[in-house]
Regions:
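RNA/tRNA-interacting regions in translation and RNA-turnover enzymes
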Residues: 1-252
């Protein structure tokens, strides 16, 4: 995982040099692979730090997790992101039913989307410095939240969903074409997101191509979920899909 030092400083007040910060991160068990200085047109002098995080530190696969460790060490104030409440303005057009392998599954419908709009430059810079390519505002904001909070999000094109959503295991013979165009034959233990007609995502790993966001997308269902780590870990290995979402969801977060 790599990140901007200036972005980290928004979450925890650290006044040490980049070199000292890297030494302290390593002592805290977050080994620094490398770092490089960067001059930002938006935030001034900055550094990009790359960590080699071990599987037992799943709580540090986010800026907030790293900031929490540094806050405890330095005795500095931890500043949580301040969410803005957005009241519901439309009725939910569908229902969601889940199984026990999805202890938490929530989402929000967002309409009147214009993908001709550009991602704000600061968000674009931060995800680029973190090793992600800026694609469009929807993908960019899901990656931003993933990096900052460690919570994977997935956006479905609402107009491509047919009926209610389900979190379930496959029916015999079901298949799914993923966003990377890989076609997979689903096993009995492959946890899925489906609508009433078909599978639409391999839960916690990758969405399906058929319901993916495109330049013509106007409405989305934005998913935020926690799946039991064992249900994700085995499938990620089986299909050789170690995605940024599956890495985080397959680890136990503290």
């Amino acid at each position: 995982m790599q990140f901007s030092k200036n972005w980290l400083r928004e979450l925890v007040d650290i006044k040490v040099s980049t070199e000292e910060l890297c030494e302290q991160l390593t002592l805290l068990g977050l080994e620094v692979d490398n770092y490089k200085n960067y001059q930002s047109d938006l935030t001034g002098e900055d550094s990009v730090i790359k960590l080699d995080i071990t599987p037992n530190r799943g709580d540090c696969f986010s800026l907030l997790g790293i900031a929490r460790e540094l806050s405890a060490f330095y005795g500095s104030q931890l500043s949580y992101p301040n969410p803005i409440e957005v009241k519901q303005s439309i009725e939910s057009p569908l229902d969601v039913k889940v199984c026990k392998s999805a202890p938490s599954y929530i989402g929000r419908f967002i309409t009147k989307i214009d993908l001709n709009k550009k991602t704000p430059l600061l968000i674009k810079e931060r995800i680029n410095l973190s090793g992600f390519r800026s694609i469009d505002p929807i993908v960019d904001i899901t990656n931003y939240v993933l990096l900052q909070l460690g919570q994977p999000l997935h956006a479905f094109d609402q107009d491509k969903l047919q009926g209610d959503l389900r979190v379930r295991f496959p029916k015999k013979g079901e298949k799914l074409t993923l966003l990377d165009e890989q076609k997979i034959q689903l096993d009995d233990d492959s946890l899925l997101i489906t609508d009433e007609k078909k599978p639409v995502a391999l839960a916690g790993i990758m969405g399906g191509l058929e319901t993916g966001v495109s330049p013509d997308t106007e409405s989305i269902f934005l998913e935020s979920a926690f799946f039991k780590p064992g249900a994700i870990r085995g499938q990620a290995r089986k299909f050789k899909l170690q995605t940024d979402a599956s890495i985080r969801l397959s680890l136990i977060h503290i």
